[in-house]
Structure formats: structure tokens, C-alpha cells
Amino acid sequence: MIKLGNGRVKALLLVIVLVAAAVIGGCAQSNNPEPSPATLKGVSLSPRSFQQADFTDFFQKAKQAGEVVSWAGDWNELSNTQNGSPTVVASLASTYGYIPLIEAQFFTQSSGALLRPLDENTRRSYKDSAVAFAQRYQPKYLALGIEVNILYEKSPSDFDVFVQFYGEVYDAIKAVSPDTKVFTIFQLEKMKGLNGGLFGGTNDSSKAEWSLLDRFPKSDIIAFTTYPGLIFGNPAEIPAEYYSEIKSHTSKPLAFTEIGWHSAVSPAGWESSEAEQAEFVAAFFQLTRDLDSELAIWSFMYDPQTFEPFDSMGLRHADGTARPAWAEWVKAR
């Protein structure tokens, strides 16, 4: 549920600052990540601000948080292979010693509205940009679509178009970058039929969407976003089989590309705390210990400027200080 950037100005500023950070960081940083454990941890690109010093700070701390830095944004950004945001994130990977995870989105999760119609011209542009990006950067991970089961709920016809299109793009990417792991991303709570809590509906397991996994036979990884704090009042309420259930629906490698739990004493009825957030971090790794997940990405290093409860999901405060959840995340394996 990471939101797209606030317009072209912010995207341009992001690129400028990232390039500046690369110049300053230079060769003093390690060229490659250390050999990694079975589950690669990481955080999304979520600095305190778009100032140069804060970007440098983010990449330095990202090495403590894990091996991966993810970027999620408008699919069209892939087309700018000179200085687009995903291009710069991929380029800085060797400088700061992380593995980039690039996630290209084509619709708005809150409404289901397409960023642009999936007509022939758009599909051609999306496909060409993804292939060019993959050919140039040979990324280890490239996701096409974020929380696509939400699109299925809001616009089944657009979802059907994407399913066919995804298969075409998958084949084209593999032709130029065969080692890239290509996949789409689902929203786990909704996949389970959990639409209650802060989603505003009711929980109904008969509305589970597990069958959608079969619509993507070419997905190299089955990936999810997960925000159980939108459904459960505290981590102790999460069922023991909450994550292990996934294995009954697929034998493919698993990944969690967004993980989050808020730390604020709001919204009303869903009050949390920093201690509770840390408790969830520990609970998540305990509940997923037997899954051999390939990726575990926390949504925000720093609190983002967005609506609640996402605005208090950072592992660190906006002032730079660490929450208890930061220590839990760093030590988790």
C-alpha cells in the first residue's frame, strides 16, 4: 500500500538528490552486499526527506536494515533509463552495496483506477520500458503490478487485460535478462477474504482470492504485501497459521514486499504503541520461520507523510531516532 510519489516535481527532485548522493558516497562504499541469508531483508526507499544529507543517511542505515532496497512507482518511470528514479536506484546498488527490488505499478490501489488506459499504445510502452530496463540493468528482482488482487476486486475487466499482458512482458524480459526474477504482487489480507477492521468491510473467508495465484503461472515468486494491523487489534491476535497457510496454495518461493504495523495511539479503536510495533516485528519472523521466504521488506524506514495508520509505520521517527521496532528488525533472522 505504498503510495506513488506526489507528482513530477518530487520525482525530479528525487533523481537529483540521488545522483548527488552517489557522487558524495563514491567509491568509499562497498561494491557488493555480503553473502546473504535465506531470507533477504530490507526496506523501501523511504528517507526522512528529499534533502541530500537525508538520502545519504538512508542508504547508510539501509545496510543495517538488510540487503535490499525497494522502489515502487509509476511503470512509466522505467522508460527513463538515463536518470529516472528506478534507474538511479538500480545504479546506486553497487555504490551502497544493496540489492535493488524494482516494483512497477499501473493503477491506484485506493480506487482501482488505471494510471493510464491499458490500450495497445500503453501496453507497448510499458512492455518496451520494462524490457529496456531489464536488458540494461539485469535486476535480480522486477515486480510488475502491486496488490493486483485489489484491481481484480474493483475492475475485473482491467485485471483480465493485465493477466494476459503480464505473460507477454514476462517472456520479453526473460529473453533479455533470463536471471531476473519476475513476478506480480498480491495484498495478503484481502487475498484471505479479510476485509474488516480498517478496511471497513467484513471478514469472510469464503471471499478468499487464492485462485488468482493460478492466473500467473509465469510468476517466479509469489509475493505479498501484509498489514495485519488493519485487521487485528494486536499481534497476539494473529493466528499461528496466518502466514504458513500460504504454503497450502502454492509451492513457489514466497516474498513479502511490504510489511507494516503502526505505532501511534490512533485511529480510535485501533490504538497501537511503539512496543506493540516491535512485538509485531518479532511475531512476524516467528510466524514465518518455516516458510523460507526469499524477501522480507519493511515498508518504511522513516515515518512517511501520509494518512494514518501508515504515517506511524516507520522503524524510525521522523526526527531520526529509532523506535524499538528498529532493533527488533535489525537483529531478526
PLM regions and their residue ranges:
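C-terminal motif of bacterial Sec signal peptides marking the signal peptidase cleavage site
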Residues: 24-26
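Aromatic- and acid-rich polysaccharide-binding/catalytic face
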Residues: 71-76, 140, 146, 198-237, ...
